[in-house]
Amino acid sequence: MIPDVSQALAWLEKHPQALKGIQRGLERETLRVNADGTLATTGHPEALGSALTHKWITTDFAEALLEFITPVDGDIEHMLTFMRDLHRYTARNMGDERMWPLSMPCYIAEGQDIELAQYGTSNTGRFKTLYREGLKNRYGALMQTISGVHYNFSLPMAFWQAKCGDISGADAKEKISAGYFRVIRNYYRFGWVIPYLFGASPAICSSFLQGKPTSLPFEKTECGMYYLPYATSLRLSDLGYTNKSQSNLGITFNDLYEYVAGLKQAIKTPSEEYAKIGIEKDGKRLQINSNVLQIENELYAPIRPKRVTRSGESPSDALLRGGIEYIEVRSLDINPFSPIGVDEQQVRFLDLFMVWCALADAPEMSSKELACTRVNWNRVILEGRKPGLTLGIGCETAQFPLPQVGKDLFRDLKRVAQTLDSINGGEAYQKVCDELVACFDNPDLTFSARILRSMIDTGIGGTGKAFAEAYRNLLREEPLEILREEDFVAEREASERRQQEMEAADTEPFAVWLEKHA
């Protein structure tokens, strides 16, 4: 079932320096909660400056949904320590509140209780809040409070030059973009390994169902928790953060121009369903527009091609200008066993898997096959640890046992690990392979199995509160390592100044400005 990458691995072993200079970044979302686990109703902590313009700490959907962002980094340890510093400083500056350590929220009875993220009075800031108003009215606020970790990854120019020859200009844009689309297609075909190993949302609080019927065969504990005994990541299921209305958009990942055209089409395509919401009611704007996507970021995807945008530039226009610069992996649940929601083992595994995805052959993928890959993902998401579980290839009928496919994949990853260790020194990547491959013979070692044992004992709420309290105490006590207190103070002041400058620079009323941007 795994493509034959022996030739590509032999090539890599002859060109190990092609992997020197991998760049990555991390983003981690977490809800601010009170000591009893309920959602914090306070505004964004003052010490964190402006959520609109802060370089490292912002908010996602809700005012209480923090998002931490590391700069691009070539050093894993440095990146994780930087992320930890962001958590340490925040933990000391959020009063008695804690950071919720799980992807799935609990103790939120009503979506109406959730305040949308606020970004001030600039047109850009108001636009961001209006976008969130649209998300709330389309999908419900509760779904938007699900948290995850995003891992951004780029291969060094040396890799592309070793693979494609001496490339530059338009040629480089085309070939590098084609290479990243290969990564994306392989990710859709084999990325289910991520929720298998690291999924950590096998259960949900009853409030999350909000009385809606579900066809999933949930088991229920006395404290009202619903769980599937072999589930890995309900966050990635239809109960979690997905968008069914997008499933027939026909966006494909074979070609840069085709992908961008599909994305731009979705932004222009009217939606009957969202038209029913209306655009305005009693003088209050309800969404940016009633198209299938209000803006490009609304496209739900487990992985995205990206390029850093210039001021006023849309993500797709940035891709057209310069091609794909990096990949954003979006399938990671919050790691409840780490105070910062992600750990070194996961980052090293993702490095290995992304390199493998860049090496393995990846035939073009029709929108039909893309839909078929969802079958494997859903199996792993809902019953990944079930004994005897099998997976298919694309839309074919042949089935293969998941543990065997996983072990075959890791046989390849081990060779990638040897190459990465040879240029970085030590055996850190090989050690990660040895630790994780054991999860295929013993699913009890996976994150989902480990966290479910705790949740069955103490419920999601009890588990979340215990971890949140422990991490709060730990992070508040730890000294900063990379950043200093004065760095945070300077960035707070600079971010507030940047927001004020944006507000002062606006010349048009929001309604006029919006007509040009909606």
UniProtKB/Swiss-Prot annotation:
NCBIfam families: glu_cys_ligase. Its EC number is 6.3.2.2. It comes from Escherichia coli O127:H6 (strain E2348/69 / EPEC). It catalyses: L-cysteine + L-glutamate + ATP = gamma-L-glutamyl-L-cysteine + ADP + phosphate + H(+). GO terms for biological process: glutathione biosynthetic process. One of its GO terms (molecular function) is glutamate-cysteine ligase activity. PANTHER family: GLUTAMATE--CYSTEINE LIGASE (PTHR38761:SF1). It is an enzyme of class 6 (ligase). The keyword Magnesium does not apply. This is Glutamate--cysteine ligase. One of its GO terms (cellular component) is cytosol. Pathway: Sulfur metabolism; glutathione biosynthesis; glutathione from L-cysteine and L-glutamate: step 1/2. Keywords: ATP-binding, Glutathione biosynthesis, Ligase, Nucleotide-binding. InterPro entries: Gln_synth/guanido_kin_cat_dom, Glu_cys_ligase, Glut_cys_ligase. Belongs to the glutamate--cysteine ligase type 1 family. Type 1 subfamily. Gene3D superfamilies: 3.30.590.20.
